[in-house]
Each structure stands twice: as structure tokens, then as C-alpha cells.
Amino acid sequence: MASNSRSSISPWTFSQNKMFERALAVYDKDTPDRWHNVAKAVGGKTVEEVKRHYDILVEDLINIETGRVPLPNYKTFESNSRSINDFDTRKMKNLKI
């Protein structure tokens, strides 16, 4: 008998999470056999595990969007009177599309 407990499911690796994200972009909600395709793309996870992972992701997004998850207090990084945003802006100027 399968359990819905998170502890009975093996942890997701960084690579599996990335493959999951990519598969969600490829197989949208209208794709036939979406969860089978996503599970196959991820590898090492069942259709049920993939669905549960998606449900947790949606739940997390809802909690963030409704303000139930507090934003971290980021410290301003300054070096030579330039903030991190200045650094990012300089990097973006060299970006070629």
C-alpha cells in the first residue's frame, strides 16, 4: 500500500529538479500523458512522485504569492561605493543576445 507521507519518497536531486522544471516547460497541462512524460524525462521517479512534487511546488507558490512566506532580509552588498545592482547592471551591458 502506497503512503502519501513525504518521508517515504526519496529526496529529489538538483539534477532531477532541473529536469522536472524543463519537462514542465515542454509538457504543458494540455499534453496527453503529461505526468508519464515528465516522470520519464526526470528519471528515477514515478508518476505519483512527480504529481506530488508538482502539487508541493504549486502549494509553495501560492504561499509565497499570498505573503505567507516572509521574504528574507537581504543585506546590501557594497564595494567601493557600488551596490550589487551596479555590478549586475555592468554585467548586463556586456550581454549579447
UniProtKB/Swiss-Prot annotation:
On whether Nucleus is a keyword of this UniProt record, the answer is: yes
Q: Which domain of life is it from?
A: Eukaryota
Q: What is its main location?
A: nucleus
Does the record's keyword annotation contain Transcription regulation? Answer: yes
Q: Which GO terms describe its molecular function?
A: DNA-binding transcription factor activity
Q: Tell me which residues make up the SANT domain.
A: 7-59
- Taking the record's annotation, the residue ranges forming a coiled coil are none
Other notes:
Assigned as a member of the MYB-related gene family, I-box-binding-like subfamily.
Q: What function is annotated for this protein? A: Probable transcription factor.
Q: What is this protein called?
A: Protein RADIALIS-like 6
Gene symbol here is RL6
